[in-house]
Structure formats: structure tokens, C-alpha cells
Curated annotation (Swiss-Prot):
HAMAP family, sorted: Ribosomal_uS10 (MF_00508)
Family, similarity comment: Belongs to the universal ribosomal protein uS10 family.
NCBIfam families, per database record: PRK00596.1, rpsJ_bact
Lineage: Bacteria, Thermotogati, Thermotogota, Thermotogae, Thermotogales
Key words of the record: Ribonucleoprotein, Ribosomal protein
BP-aspect Gene Ontology terms: translation
Subunit structure: Part of the 30S ribosomal subunit.
Pfam families recorded: Ribosomal_S10
Name the record gives this protein: Small ribosomal subunit protein uS10
One of the record's GO cellular component terms: ribosome
Molecular functions (GO terms): structural constituent of ribosome; tRNA binding
Superkingdom in the source lineage: Bacteria
Function: Involved in the binding of tRNA to the ribosomes.
Length: 102
């Protein structure tokens, strides 16, 4: 498929699982002789939630919760049909969100 590019965006709360998944995708794509750019680490989304510890008073006592979303980007340049078939068969761990653009 000349001139075509597949962009894969991965998101997860756990960066270790995310890096493992990115490594699997890169290995599969390289085994089918596709050109690869990445995995490129994108900025981590960080959300902070502050909650009162008690139900109705003691405003000075608060608890903080944080949610981080780690992201990686992988570009597969000029993929073959063999590459696409191999990517469809990959079994990734739960907790990894995969977004694919052609």
C-alpha cells in the first residue's frame, strides 16, 4: 500500500503495561518488514480530585486523588496487507485503549 500510513495511539493508566503493548506492536510490524516510527511518548494527562474527608464539616481535612493517563504513538509507514493481518491478530492486555487511524 504505497503512500499509506497507519497511526496507532495507545492510552493506559499503567505505563508498564502500555510500554509492553507498544513493544508487541513494534515487534509484529517489524516482523512483516514495515517501516516504523515510535513508540513516541506523548504528554501524560494528569487529573487531581480533592475531596472532603468528613461528610459535613472539617473543611481543612481533605484527601487528594490523582488519575494519570499515559499515552504512546506509533506510526507504521507503508504497511503491507500482511502487516495489517498480523496487527489484527495481536492480543493486548486489558486496560490498554487502542485508537487506529489510516
Amino acid at each position: 500500500m504505497p503512500g499509506q500510513k497507519i497511526r496507532i495511539k495507545l492510552k493506559a493508566y499503567d505505563h508498564e503495561v502500555l510500554d509492553e503493548s507498544a513493544k508487541k506492536i513494534v515487534e509484529v510490524a517489524k516482523s512483516t518488514n514495515a517501516k516504523i516510527s515510535g513508540p513516541i511518548p506523548l504528554p501524560t494527562e494528569r487529573a487531581l480530585y480533592v475531596v472532603l474527608r468528613s461528610p459535613h464539616k472539617h473543611k481543612d481535612s481533605r484527601e487528594q486523588f490523582e488519575k494519570r493517563v499515559h499515552k504512546r504513538l506509533i506510526d507504521i509507514i507503508e504497511p503491507s496487507p500482511k502487516t495489517i493481518d498480523a496487527l489484527m491478530k495481536i492480543n493486548l492486555p486489558a486496560g490498554v485503549d487502542v485508537e487506529i487511524k489510516l
